[in-house]
Amino acid sequence: MLRVVEGIFIFVVISESVFGVLGNGFIGLVNCIDCAKNKLSTIGFILTGLAISRIFLIWIIITDGFIQIFSPNIYASSNLIEYISYFWVIGNQSSMWFATSLSIFYFLKIANFSNYIFLWLKSRTNMVLPFMIVFLLISSLLNFAYIAKILNDYKMKNDTVWDLNMYKSEYFIKQILLNLGVIFFFTLSLITCVLLIISLWRHNRQMQSNVTGLRDSNTEAHVKAMKVLISFIILFILYFIGMAIEISYFTVRENKLLLMFGMTTTAIYPWGHSFILILGNSKLKQASLRVLQQLKCCEKRKNLRVT
């Protein structure tokens, strides 16, 4: 019975990975076509970077998980876990700072506040956002340098061989340090989401005072952006829970189902958010509908040939 359950978990994880690669690949392809036509916008650049980093992150999650499931001795007898940790940090941080840039973009484009600094930033969104992306990238690189030092110190402490049976407290502390940058970026996204909610609440109060009774375009934009941001926050919390479950597997190595459940939960974030972005972006949604229509036409042609 245990093997059947393991097979189901592996099937689900592989399916999530395939959907994630397809969804993020579609986002990247649509924006790359716009880039070839010299039509790539700021949000297109952010979505492309987010899609590429998510695909990279999916491969790292799957590679790490399958090694732990099928060949855990590889980690104990080599430095592979060190390289996987480096790649995971790169994928995780780049994905997070692109997602944070997207949150800031929605906030500057849609929110309404009378603060002078906010109005100045809002009027120069297309100029400010590239600097913001560079700032997030630099902070990510600085954090990565600190993470590299942590990993290197731990490697030297264990005589160049990673000890997978370390004390629980030491391992959890190391994981918290590795995720400091991600927590910082997530906090920024959470702040922008809260500010968007405040902006929507104020806007609704103004609309009620005008007694229009109708939802204007600004309200629709607020709601659409909030759906994307709130879904991102929920999915990232699931991702973090999945990571915590996978980390706890290092202390309970006999229970592989724990690892598989953690992988399944972790993989929801990179593939689920990609489809939410497609549905929430009019250009991506229209492109996906055209692809589906073409697939239906191809299916009808095949059926006609068979008959």
Curated annotation (Swiss-Prot):
Function according to Swiss-Prot or TrEMBL: Receptor that may play a role in the perception of bitterness and is gustducin-linked. May play a role in sensing the chemical composition of the gastrointestinal content. The activity of this receptor may stimulate alpha gustducin, mediate PLC-beta-2 activation and lead to the gating of TRPM5.
Cytoplasmic side: 28-42, 122-126, 201-227, 279-307
Miscellaneous comment: Most taste cells may be activated by a limited number of bitter compounds; individual taste cells can discriminate among bitter stimuli.
Membrane recorded as keyword: yes
Similarity comment: family membership: Belongs to the G-protein coupled receptor T2R family.
Topology relative to the membrane: Multi-pass membrane protein
TM region positions: 7-27, 43-63, 101-121, 127-147, 180-200, 228-248, 258-278
Chief localisation class: membrane
Species whose genome carries this gene: Pan troglodytes (Chimpanzee)
GO cellular component assignments: membrane; plasma membrane
Protease among keywords: no
Descriptive protein name: Taste receptor type 2 member 10
Residue spans, topological domain Extracellular: 1-6, 64-100, 148-179, 249-257
A Pfam family it matches: TAS2R
Domain of life: Eukaryota
Keywords: G-protein coupled receptor, Glycoprotein, Membrane, Receptor, Sensory transduction, Taste, Transducer, Transmembrane, Transmembrane helix
Residues the record marks as carrying a glycan: 158
Gene: TAS2R10
Subcellular location field: Membrane
GO molecular function, one term: G protein-coupled receptor activity
Recorded coiled-coil stretches: none
